[in-house]
Amino acid sequence: LLVLSNSEIATVTGISGAGSFEQYIQYTPAADAEIVSNGKLKTIGVMSDAPSGAATPAVLTRAGLNLSQCAHFLINSGLQIVPGVPYYDLRAKHGYDIRVRPGVPDAPEIRDASRRLAGCCDCDLAVIGETIPGGTTTALCVLRALGYNANVSSSFAANPTALKEKVVREAMYGASISPGSLRDDPMRAVKLFGDPMMPCVVGLTEGFLNSGKEVLLAGGTQMGAVAAILKELNLSDDVVLATTKYVFDDASARFIELVEALEIDAFSAYPDFSKSSISALQKYEQGEVKEGVGAGGAMTLACISGYDQDAYRQEVEAVIKQL
C-alpha cells in the first residue's frame, strides 16, 4: 500500500529535494503514484526526480513490484494534486504549516477511516510505503514531541538539519509544547506537528494487526516516526521496518539509534547502482534521495522473490528507459 500525501512544509525553501523543480514539488506524490502504477507520467510532464538529477525512488518501487508481482494499492490521504490513476480517497485535508497551525486537524478521522479500510483488505503481509515531500521535517517534530532525541534523513546528500531544527523549534514554541511532553498523547503530537500520512499509516497498521495480518513499514526515518507513534499506542510489537542501505548508512540520520530506542526490528535492502550506466541511479551511491515511495520494502519483496542485485538493477534501468 502506498500512502500519498502533501504538506505545506514542503514549500519551505531548501527543506525538500523531492521533485525536480520547487514550483512543482506538490506534484511529486501524484507523479510517483503514476510511475508505480503505470510506469509512465500522466498528470505532469516533469519527472519527480531530485534537483540533483537523481532518479525518483518511484522507479525503484516500480521495479521491485514488477519482479515480485505483488499487488499494490494507492491511498489518497491529503493530496493537493491527485494522480491520473485509480486510488482510494480518504477525503483527508492536506497537511498545514506546523509553524502557524496544527498540521493535521483531522488526524483522528484519518486514523479511523484507515483502520476500517485495512479491515477490508485481504492479504497475508501488508507492506506500507509513503510519498510526501517535506515529511522528514514533520517526522522530526513528532519525534521531538514524543521525547526522542533523534535525527532524520534527507533526500539531499547534504542533510539540511539546521533548517529542519529551526522549523521544529518554531512549531513547538508556537504550540507551547516542550520536547517529550506529548509522549502520553501521541495522536495529539500527530495532530499538532505531523502530516496526513502519519495517521493513515497508524490506522492501517492498527487495522491489519487487529485482523491478524503482519505489517512491514517500508521507509526510513519517516516510518521511524510512525513506529514511535505506534510504540506509544502499544501497537508496535508485531511491526517491522524495512529501508535502504542509504538510510542505514546515513550518519546524519542516526537511524540505527532510533530503531534501538524504539526496540523495533528493522532491516535494510542493499542495492548496488555503482555498476549502472545511468547517472540518475549512480547518484544514490553518492547519498542522494536514499529512500521513499516504499522503495526499501519493494526491494525487499524482490529479494524475497529470488532476485539478486544485478537483476534488480537491470529492472530499475528498464523502468527508467520506459519512462
Model feature map: region roles:
Residues 1-129, 133-323:
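N-terminal loops that bind phosphate or other acidic moieties
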